[in-house]
């Protein structure tokens, strides 16, 4: 019940009187005189409210002083009686259970009974958490109760004055104002008793069905009855409806009044039937009051009846009023269906929540339906009143009665909801007492069991995917909205959890029921942030399957934050580091990519959680997340990956390292970088007017707000590093470095040492520096710079530029790969293979070897010097090529589809081949050209063949087979040996790598599919 001030009471009384005056304004003089006289008769009984205190009353919880002080503030007269309480109740109230009575002094409130009622509400309020319309708080105070009674009395008694007018006009009977007032007092006593009943055990659903049946068989009311029967099936909905059964009796008032065509006997019979057969004795006081008014009013006016019946049938139930309630039932059914699986896994919380929504939904539906019917009846009477003067006072009376009932309904609704919530809370408490475990934690256990069932195929295959013997999988079950909702409903927000983390073990495609026997220590401690795999005898994968919340303890406190508002606040006593002890003797994999390392603490401030990982002597792999880490890799060949999640803009620096494998890694998180962040969120749950906000930890994969964060990793004894998907920077040490750029346009410098640098995807720049380096461009348009030393450069796909530096002793391999590449050799002996595409090859001043295959595009060889340069046409027969001079260049054409076209440059252009004849001191010629079978063309043999053609006035071109100097399969062996020596020297390959690289550049003996013979090739000379 809301707190009502004296001013509001005065305003309500004034409004009721003004309404009556307005109705009277259009009436005749005799009507006005009658109303005035009736008002005078009832003034003493109706407008005087007295708090009666017997001499033997001392006061209980709400002290006598509180009652007296409150009555004074509200203008309620306080009287002390010399008689004791027993004598007064017999004289005035007839029973000790009545709260309000009527004497010649006025309307009296019996102080002992009021105090008893207050105590009952206060106990109920404490039991229910203080949330039912200020039960145990404001309603527990005398002021609110007294003021509410005063408001009800004022409204009802004002209507009684209008009832007297009807009596005088229609029947001339002699019904005194005191009789009407007594009937009103009986109504209020009954409604107060009904609203105060928290333990009524009658089944509301059964009564509702009976009521619909009775109304369906009652003349003029069958339409409304049918609609009531069409309510959702509420049978067996639960004991939560027990608190509503008494309230339903109030509906009888509206229906008895609404049947204006029924005679007095019918109305009386309907009242008795509704009261005794359907509602029992609960509505007796209300029915007595209504029957008394029926006798006084004589509602048989035909003009009013037609409009009234039509209005009631049309307006009785509005579907819009029940949409939200229907959704509530629908959701409850879905939750109940969802709960079936988890019941089997040992958790009944979802079913409990579904029951709560069904029970409170039934309460909501019933009360909403009652209120809707009451409102529609009142509206119907108001409509009828426009055609009849008699209808006007009837409308005012019904408005007063329905207003009183609606007030009781509203004041009782919250208590009903809380009653249901308390039952659910009792179930939870009993379960925890029996099992010695947190109920909501048990809910997460069930969720995790279902997760394991649903994802078994994936989880059981991780050991194969990562090539290990055992998988140790850590899973975080995050905040569950249904579990959180149940905690809020039952006022258990301080007992719930943000989730729970679990550890599971898999071997040979099977989940182990318990941890392996060799684990003597605690493997996983999420409170302290410790993970210990040091006992493991197997190669192991440590993987965080779902984002893991930061380590630490959650502390919760539930407090009241408003009139009906409660909040459960969360404090995290966090640990700022994860400490991981790795497998000692077996190579293992540590996947930290789902580890949350940033926790938002408000105002764009973040708490960082580092990873400290102590690995063993095996060949380990580490996948890092977006936060800082210290990796002590130990012995073995260890690899650290930054490309499995967004780890920011990466700079790897080994320039200051004093030991091999030591790097400082700086990462900038900001801009477009998204990282896993732990955040605190709130779930809000409503139980009627009570709202419960529960804070919990969750995570977001999002941008860092407002600023850039810089993270620093310290890596020790790490042999290989894989970058991010962004533009990374790598600066190598003076030792051997192995860097992978991964995706993005990377800048990689090996510096000193024999380095291996991989650009991977993106337009990368790789610089080997000093040392025998291997550089791999990968996809993209890359630039590879070999630096001093013997280098191996492979451009990969894309339009790449490869260049090497070094003196005459250097030996380098330059392989362009697919794309239009540019290859620049050194002063030493270089092996240049442009690959597919239209490439430029410049060998430099050393004795270089060029390589060309039939599937390549148009290559340009621009050789600047060297006295023993060679070209290997590895899969081409000289019978499939022709040579022709074009200015100072020599053009080699190759056959395509058995057609050799002189007008299409599809082979090789030898730049400045003939410049030496013009006095050029440089040697731009290739001293030996080999075909696949070891036959050789030299500059001299080619010159003679061209001169022969010219001197005999023949074509300006010459077939390769006609320009041979000598030929033998054995000529290939020295060439192969030279290629092998360059490969062996370049890039510091180990034995296996040498063989692999050599096989890529091996000469083919039978690669051509052409039919050889002068007439098998069609030669065209078109432009």
From Swiss-Prot:
Gene Ontology annotations of biological process type: hemolysis in another organism; protein secretion by the type I secretion system
Modification comment: Myristoylated by HlyC; the toxin only becomes active when modified. Mainly myristoylated, while a minor fraction is acylated with pentadecanoyl (C15:0; 26%) and heptadecanoyl (C17:0; 6%) fatty acyl groups. Fatty acylation is involved in binding to host membranes and promotes the irreversible insertion of Hemolysin into the host cell membrane. Can be activated by both myristoylation and palmitoylation, but HlyC catalyzes lysine myristoylation.
Localization annotation: Secreted; Host cell membrane
Lipid-modified residues, N6-myristoyl lysine kind: 563, 689
Keyword Zinc-finger in record: no
Gene Ontology CC terms, in alphabetical order: extracellular space; host cell plasma membrane; membrane
Keywords: Calcium, Cytolysis, Hemolysis, Host cell membrane, Host membrane, Lipoprotein, Membrane, Myristate, Repeat, Secreted, Toxin, Transmembrane, Transmembrane helix, Virulence
Biased composition (Basic and acidic residues): 747-763
The UniProt record lists the keyword Transmembrane: yes
Function: Bacterial hemolysins are exotoxins that attack blood cell membranes and cause cell rupture by forming a pore.
Protein known as: Hemolysin, chromosomal
Natural source organism: Escherichia coli
Taxonomic path: Bacteria, Pseudomonadati, Pseudomonadota, Gammaproteobacteria, Enterobacterales
